């Protein structure tokens, strides 16, 4: 185990030195980002330089031709689905998801990543996606291992979803641990 820690430390130091050297020796123009072919642009919580999870952010993502838009989904006490990262307490919190879907439906090349903050939204979300004919362009993220059963038991059971799971960087060298991860993936779909 000690050798893994030493390796991790040396790798971290090398990365820091490399980034620092790059930042110091390159001019601003040389440091501009360039994207490789088939790079996907995702508008996280809407779009850069807008307030998260707002209709303004959705409009900006559409205007900038984002290929995927990520929206955090929660439910108001009155059962309205809204875009919100934070817990929704009142019936005025968050922008209504239905308003965002009305904008997105006319953008046929945009996929939608719904970050599920609470599983009670799943059946209502599915109904909205069917109503707006967006089911085939949508997928779920933010799914914790303990929430997989709720997804599988919901109307969203046939949608693609991505599991939130952070495997150990150090245990990954163990065959037993890798088998545990494979089993977890099999069990969660």
Regions found by a protein language model. Give the residues of each.
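Phosphate-group recognition and catalysis centered on beta-loop-alpha active-site segments
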Residues: 1-189
């Amino acid at each position: 185990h000690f050798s893994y820690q030493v390796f991790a430390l040396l790798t971290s130091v090398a990365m820091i030195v490399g980034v620092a050297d790059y930042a110091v020796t390159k001019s601003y123009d040389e440091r501009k980002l360039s994207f490789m072919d088939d790079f996907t642009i995702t508008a996280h919580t809407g779009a850069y330089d807008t307030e998260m999870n707002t209709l303004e952010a959705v409009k900006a993502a559409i205007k900038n031709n984002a290929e995927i838009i990520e929206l955090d989904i929660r439910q108001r006490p009155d059962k309205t689905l809204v875009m919100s990262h934070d817990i929704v307490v009142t019936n005025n919190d968050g922008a209504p998801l239905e308003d965002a879907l009305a904008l997105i439906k006319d953008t046929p090349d945009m996929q939608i990543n719904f970050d599920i903050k609470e599983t009670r939204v799943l059946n209502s979300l599915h109904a909205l996606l069917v109503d707006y004919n967006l089911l085939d362009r949508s997928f779920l993220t933010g799914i914790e291992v303990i929430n997989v059963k709720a997804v599988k038991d919901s109307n969203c059971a046939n949608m693609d979803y991505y599991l939130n799971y952070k495997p150990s960087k150090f245990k990954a060298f163990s065959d037993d641990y890798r088998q545990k991860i494979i089993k977890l993936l099999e069990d969660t779909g």
